[in-house]
UniProtKB/Swiss-Prot annotation:
It is found in: Secreted. It comes from Phytophthora nicotianae. One of its GO terms (cellular component) is extracellular region. The structure of NLP effectors is remarkably conserved with a high level of conservation of a central region containing the conserved undecapeptide motif AIMYAWYFPKD and heptapeptide motif GHRHDWE. This is Necrosis-inducing protein NPP1. The gene is NPP1. Secreted effector that acts as a pathogen-associated molecular pattern (PAMP) recognized by the plant immune system. Induces necrotic cell death and ethylene biosynthesis in parsley. Stimulates early induced host cellular responses implicated in elicitor signal transmission such as increased levels of cytoplasmic calcium, production of reactive oxygen species (ROS), and MAP kinase activation. A motif (Conserved heptapetpide motif) lies at residues 120-126. Residues 1-19 form the signal peptide. Belongs to the Necrosis inducing protein (NPP1) family. Disulfide bonds: none annotated.
Length: 237
C-alpha cells in the first residue's frame, strides 16, 4: 500500500468512526444541488408534493458526514416531536430504467410511525415511484404513479389528472384504524416539496450510512439491496 492509498483509507476510516446516530432534529439536510446529468434533471422536474394528513412530517435521515437520525419512540400524539425540522426536510431520489421506461423513486424519512399513542415503531420510510416514458424527451409524460403502502403499492395507471400538478405527483401520508401504520396514496390535495438529493449526489459517508444503518422496522427503499426489487414490485403492468 503506497502512502497516498494509506492516507485515503485512513481518512475514510476516520469518517466512518466519526459518523454517529444523533437526535432526529439535529440532522442537517443536503441543500438541493444543481442538476447536471439527465437523471438529476429529471429528478428535479418530476419532484413530487407530499401532503401530511396525520403523523410526522418528513425529516432528513442522514447528514453529509454520515450521521443518521435516531428517530423517536412511538409516544405522545402521532405528530408529537416531529412537526418539522428547523433545518428543513429532504426527499431522496434515484432513477432506473425498467422494461423500456423510466422509474424515478422519491423517498421520505419520518422519525416515527405512530398512528396512536403507544402503537407503531421508531423510524418510517415511505416512497413513490413515478413512471415516465422517456426522461430525454423535451415533453416527457407520466405513465403511472406507485405510492408505497404497507410493503406494497397503490398503483395508478394512468394516474388521475387531478393528482398531478404539472410534472409533480401529489401524494398523501396518513394512517387509519383499519390498517394502523402510515402509508402513502395519491391525493388531490396540494402538498409541500423538499430539497431533493439524488443517490449519486450524496457524499460517500451519507450513502454508506444509508446502506448500513439499521432503521428497525423501516427499510431504506433506495439502497442497493432494495432499490431494483422495489422498482419491480411497483411496476404498473
Amino acid at each position: 500500500m503506497n502512502v497516498l492509498t494509506f492516507l485515503i483509507a485512513a481518512a475514510v476510516s476516520l469518517a466512518v468512526v466519526q459518523a454517529d446516530v444523533i437526535s432526529h432534529d439535529a440532522v442537517v439536510p443536503f441543500a438541493q444541488p444543481t442538476a447536471t446529468t439527465t437523471e438529476q434533471k429529471a429528478g428535479v422536474k418530476f419532484k413530487p408534493q407530499i401532503h401530511i394528513s396525520n403523523g410526522c412530517h418528513p425529516y432528513p435521515a442522514v447528514d453529509a458526514n454520515g450521521n443518521t437520525s435516531g428517530g423517536l419512540k412511538p409516544t405522545g400524539s402521532s405528530s408529537a416531536g416531529c412537526k418539522g425540522s428547523g433545518y428543513g426536510s429532504q426527499v431522496y431520489g434515484r432513477v432506473a430504467t425498467y422494461n423500456g421506461v423510466y422509474a424515478i423513486m422519491y423517498s421520505w424519512y419520518f422519525p416515527k410511525d405512530s398512528p396512536v399513542t403507544g402503537l407503531g415503531h421508531r423510524h418510517d420510510w415511505e416512497h413513490v415511484v413515478v413512471w415516465v416514458d422517456d426522461i430525454k424527451l423535451d415533453s416527457p409524460s407520466i405513465i403511472a404513479v406507485s405510492p408505497s403502502a404497507h410493503s406494497g403499492y397503490n398503483i395508478y395507471y394512468p394516474p388521475e389528472s387531478n393528482t398531478i400538478d404539472g410534472y409533480s405527483a401529489k401524494v398523501d401520508y396518513s394512517s387509519s384504524w383499519v390498517v394502523i401504520n402510515h402509508a402513502l396514496d395519491s391525493t388531490t390535495d396540494a402538498g409541500e416539496t423538499q430539497d431533493l438529493i439524488m443517490w449519486d449526489q450524496l457524499t460517500d459517508a451519507a450513502r454508506t450510512a444509508l446502506e448500513n444503518t439499521d432503521f428497525g422496522d423501516a427499510n431504506v427503499p433506495m439502497k442497493d439491496g432494495n432499490f431494483l426489487t422495489k422498482v419491480g414490485n411497483a411496476y404498473y403492468a
